[in-house]
Amino acid sequence: MIYLDYAATTPICEEALTVYQKLSMDMYGNASSLHDAGGKAKHILEYCREKIANIIGGEASGIYFTSGGTESNFLAIQSLLNGLPKTKRHFITTAMEHQSIHNCAAFLEQQGYDVTVIEPNEYGLITEEILLTHIRPETGLVSIQHANSETGIIQPIQHLSSYLHNKGILLHCDAVQTFGKIPINTKNLGVDALSMSSHKIHGPKGVGAVYIRPDVPWKPVYPLTTHEYGFRAGTVNVPGIGAFTAAAELIVSEMEKQISRNEALRTYFLDQIRIRSLPVTLAADTSKAECLPHIIGCFFHSFEGQYVMLECNRSNICISTGSACSAGYHGPSETMKALRKTEQEALQFIRISFGRHTTAEQLEQLLHTFTVLWEQKKGEFDIDRRIKANGRQQA
């Protein structure tokens, strides 16, 4: 099988799996228990907290472990809003966010919060000017993704955070697609909170983390909770967190090399698209917006993305038509709508995403599949033209 859907999830690496197995066998104590088994688990937990904090340039006291990106987003947003004055009940997010953010926004509206969903500019970027038109005195929190999971477009978070802080507004950033893929420093970005996920970086599923600056006030979603310093209820998954940390340390150690590999693979793929005259165009204008090199969101014109994905699957190649969390929905994604794509264009969208095990040979197989599909389609066009020509002659 050729797997080219790393933006959806990744296979667990051997290092993380080894740590998970060892901790499951040797450090099975509840980290909240006062006996030695609990103390050993607590020591591992705090060690992992320190390591994850170091990776993002944060403080260990600001790291809270969760069950993954979706829960990280929800708990971060809700906890920050809970900590704000009652006069700050206006929440802003963008049309291009992960579905978990949209779901959270809908839930906030049910609680009586005022929610504004802003559109990016034509290049998929949120600008200071766009924020300016929507910020109000009661705006308390803004949530903007670091990079889009479908297009790879990276938002200018550092610039936006400075602007928001000057207005006294907190900024949460969903960094699930960028953590471990590009350098992240919370101080440089200027974010107040950051969401991360394990299974996007070759760690186990069911684990994630939130970083909240220690000086930022928040109040828990779950009342009377003691786990994770009151941030999240339930017995802490120490083996999963240990494996997540092992995966994070490994991927960060390989980051520079992997970025170069991804850039080379991306260049090769796009060059071959042009050489073969395939009707494939990028969803993002890379001359106007910086993009993650391992994500190629594109349109295969004359084909529905779902059809291309299924044909690739028949050839034992895994690609995507967008976010896996919205895979059951057959229609234009919110990101495509935000980029002003027509419904026809949006339905032609496919996503190819690279990872640690991706090779040029695998991309060659994908290109071959694309070429076969296009040759078949051109043959159909020729038949249609002949039929129409014969019809005109008979008339």
Swiss-Prot record:
[2Fe-2S] cluster binds at C325. The keyword Metal-binding applies. InterPro entries: Aminotrans_V_dom, Aminotrans_V_PyrdxlP_BS, Cysteine_dSase, PyrdxlP-dep_Trfase, PyrdxlP-dep_Trfase_major, PyrdxlP-dep_Trfase_small. The keyword DNA-binding does not apply. Disruption phenotype: Cells lacking this gene require nicotinic acid for growth. Induction: Repressed in the presence of nicotinic acid. One of its GO terms (molecular function) is metal ion binding. This is Putative cysteine desulfurase NifS.
